[in-house]
C-alpha cells in the first residue's frame, strides 16, 4: 500500500530546518512511517508520513522492518 508520494533519495527538511534524505517506508508494531537518515548521523529515524517535511521521530531501535518504495 502506497502511503506517500516521496521518492527514494528525496531531500526533506525537519521542522528545525535540518536536511534529511528519504529512504523508504518503515513499520513499527503500531503504524507505518516514512524513514529518513540525517547527514552526519548514522542512525535512521522514523518520521511522520508526509512529504511536505518531516519531524524527528523514534530512533532506529523502534523499527522492526522497512522496505524501499
Annotate the PLM regions:
Residues 1-8:
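Mixed-charge, Lys/Arg-rich low-complexity intrinsically disordered regions
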